[in-house]
């Protein structure tokens, strides 16, 4: 990326997986189109284009269509579901880069952990930490890059020195961050 010229085509496209956990495929596609075309999402949704926006959106759609980009939708997921989707896409598409949106609990994770722990209830921070560990383990096992995110608690608005204490649910997630 060049700040003066924007994205520069290098001719190299790496297989990439995007795992969405809260948004439908249609929402993700619209956001991708908006980002790549630099056209407001509402203009795309309602078809109200100005100047060359429609042409840019069509070009963005072509770029996305020609890209080795794969999207998996996991609205209610377990740790095993996430791992299975990652392994499937490594096997079928040789993905090297994975974006997981985002680290949070789900009913299926709670059920999975409860079964594995013999019914012992774990706190949310422990479960979130386990998910971050699993993602990091997959990076190391398969030699892939995984990026994820998590939410911040309400203290972020007043914090002068952002740190792991602002992570909602589990500041222990920060223990597994590499960047």
Where are these regions (language model features)?
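Generic hydrophobic alpha-helical scaffold/packing signal
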Residues: 17, 29, 33, 83-90, ...
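Short glycine/proline- and charge-enriched loop/turn segments
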Residues: 36-40, 113-120, 160-165
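Conserved nucleotide-binding/hydrolysis micro-motifs of P-loop NTPases
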Residues: 22-26, 75-78, 103-106, 146, ...
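Helical mechanochemical/support elements of P-loop NTPase systems and associated helical scaffolds
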Residues: 24-28, 49, 53-56, 78-82, ...
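Phosphate-binding/switch loop-helix module in NTP-utilizing enzymes
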Residues: 69-141
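Cytosolic-facing regulatory segments adjacent to core modules
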Residues: 3-94
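Phosphate-binding/switch region of NTP-binding enzymes
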Residues: 1, 7, 11, 126-179
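Switch/connector loops and helix/strand junctions flanking conserved nucleotide-binding motifs
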Residues: 24-30, 38-39, 106-111, 155-160
């Amino acid at each position: 990326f060049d700040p003066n010229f924007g994205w520069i085509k290098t001719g190299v496209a790496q297989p990439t997986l995007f795992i969405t956990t809260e948004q439908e495929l249609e929402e993700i596609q619209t956001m991708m189109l908006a980002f790549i075309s630099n056209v407001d999402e509402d203009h795309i949704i309602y078809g109200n284009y100005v100047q060359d926006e429609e042409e840019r959106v069509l070009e963005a759609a072509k770029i996305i269509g020609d890209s080795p980009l794969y999207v998996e939708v996991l609205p209610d997921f377990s740790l095993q579901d996430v791992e299975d989707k990652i392994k499937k896409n490594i096997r079928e598409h040789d993905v090297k880069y994975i974006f997981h949106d985002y680290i949070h609990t789900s009913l299926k994770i709670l059920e999975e952990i409860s079964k594995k722990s013999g019914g012992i209830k774990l706190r949310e921070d422990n479960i979130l930490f386990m998910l971050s560990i699993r993602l990091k383990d997959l990076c190391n096992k398969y030699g892939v890059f995984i990026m994820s995110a998590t939410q911040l608690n309400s203290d972020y608005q007043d914090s002068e020195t952002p740190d792991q204490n602002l992570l909602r649910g589990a500041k222990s997630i920060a223990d597994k961050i590499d960047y």
